[in-house]
Amino acid sequence: MELRHLRYFVAVAQALNFTRAAEKLHTSQPSLSSQIRDLENCVGVPLLVRDKRKVALTAAGECFLQDALAILEQAENAKLRARKIVQEDRQLTIGFVPSAEVNLLPKVLPMFRLRQPDTLIELVSLITTQQEEKIRRGELDVGLMRHPVYSPEIDYLELFDEPLVVVLPVDHPLAHEKEITAAQLDGVNFVSTDPVYSGSLAPIVKAWFAQENSQPNIVQVATNILVTMNLVGMGLGVTLIPGYMNNFNTGQVVFRPIAGNVPSIALLMAWKKGEMKPALRDFIAIVQERLASVTA
């Protein structure tokens, strides 16, 4: 007994007419009749009652029809699941914070496409907490994110540290300085980032000011780094953010390095523990190769 026998039987059982069933199956009526006889011989009981006027199911045929439908549905589902696995293996979903968009993805994606030309890449801009949750749920293959990572289900690798810089309005009294100390920021109006959205940036900045015995005057909390920089450009205060944001400078702010003890923020690459699909293994390897070539 093969699946084609079940398909032929179901077509006849649903049409209760050999001619219409044969047309639906794109086969001849004699061939269809032969397949049904083979099936009945295999089962060992009649499944259909045939006469010149009609076709009907026997009691055994009624029962067999339900099982045949279930088997065909299971076979179709098995085929779809197998195809889905192959399709998922050929897709890589990458979450990223803005820093990775500027400093990493342009360098590694061309290399990845050369190594995995048939893999579909999906890029998703997400904050760190969203990336961690989606990695844990299997909705994201890899995340380029910040500390902290709370889930024990996730592995991660620190890629590099990015020094923070001072960003000031162009007309700020400190804008003419070549570099700025923590002491110069004591009491200065300051735009902070919301730790819910910025990951470890806000705690790093807070800890640095405490270590340097400097206390800025926080006048605004922003939901992301770009908004923070725009608020600085509007003259609300100064801020500390990674230097890569100078790529988005519209001329309303100036970037100045920090003198002395310079705080930094790490960029991480994170993925779910366990077996990796080939595309993920290649992406991780390419990122590591790229970083090794830069530091060599």
UniProtKB/Swiss-Prot annotation:
HTH lysR-type domain sequence ranges: 1-58
Alphabetized Pfam families for the sequence: HTH_1 (PF00126), LysR_substrate (PF03466)
Entry GO terms, CC: protein-DNA complex
Keyword Heme: no
Protein's GO biological process: negative regulation of DNA-templated transcription; positive regulation of DNA-templated transcription; regulation of DNA-templated transcription
Xref: NCBIfam families: PRK09906.1
GO molecular function annotation: DNA binding; DNA-binding transcription factor activity
Protein name: Hca operon transcriptional activator HcaR
Chain's role: Transcriptional activator of the hca operon for 3-phenylpropionic acid catabolism.
